[in-house]
Design a protein with these regions (language model features):
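Phosphate-/nucleic-acid-contacting segments
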Residues: 112, 151-152
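A short coil-to-beta-strand element that immediately follows conserved catalytic motifs
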Residues: 8-9, 110-117
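Acidic, metal-coordinating catalytic segment for phosphate/diphosphate chemistry
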Residues: 15-60, 74
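Beta-rich strand-turn-strand
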Residues: 92-97, 106-113
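Conserved Nudix-box catalytic region and its N-terminal flanking loop in Nudix hydrolases
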Residues: 42-45, 54, 59-101, 118, ...
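A short, amphipathic edge element
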Residues: 1-14
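Acidic pyrophosphate-coordinating catalytic loop
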Residues: 15-19, 74-76, 120-132
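Active-site-adjacent beta-strand/loop module that shapes the phosphate/pyrophosphate-binding cleft
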Residues: 27-34, 123-144
Length: 152
């Protein structure tokens, strides 16, 4: 088998939900190592790609995190409130543009020098979202608002 040969074929999709984002069921054939094609089906949730940033202060040795309510976590037995880095969906912006805006919206800090760290898929077994991770140094002078966004 050639490295560039297709390993997936005959993809069919069925829309299951588009209430908030898109949930689809895909049926496809996957080429196995023994050369046989095997039909499989999977559901995939598509909510778009996102970006995450960890703000740090080297001098104070601190980071800025936000506290947000996450309903899916709540229905899994947790109180629903998570401590996390500022993040948001790209919504047609570049990862760099979006994360600068999200950092200010959620934390109140306006950062200008962001550094990409890595990209990763959130939960690749069922979600299409790719996350772009960044870091940025902040100081007290970078504070332009209370932040908050949707954070509680």
């Amino acid at each position: 088998m050639h490295a560039d040969a297709p390993r997936v074929r005959h993809i069919r999709e069925t829309l299951l939900s588009d209430n908030w984002y898109t949930l689809k069921k895909y049926t496809f054939e996957l080429l196995r190592r023994d050369g046989r094609w095997q039909e499989q089906s999977r559901e995939a949730y598509d909510r778009g790609n996102g970006a995450v940033i960890l703000l740090y202060n080297r001098e104070k040795q601190t980071v800025v995190l936000v506290r947000q309510f996450r309903f899916p976590v709540w229905i899994n037995g947790h109180d629903g409130f998570l401590i996390e880095a500022a993040a948001g969906l790209l919504d047609d912006a570049s990862p760099e543009e979006r994360i600068v805006a999200e950092a200010e919206e959620e934390t109140g800090f306006r950062v200008t020098r962001i550094e990409p760290v890595f990209t990763a898929y959130m939960s690749p077994g069922s979600v299409t979202e790719k996350l772009y991770f960044f870091i940025a140094e902040y100081s007290a002078d970078d504070r332009h608002s209370d932040g908050g966004g949707l954070a509680l």
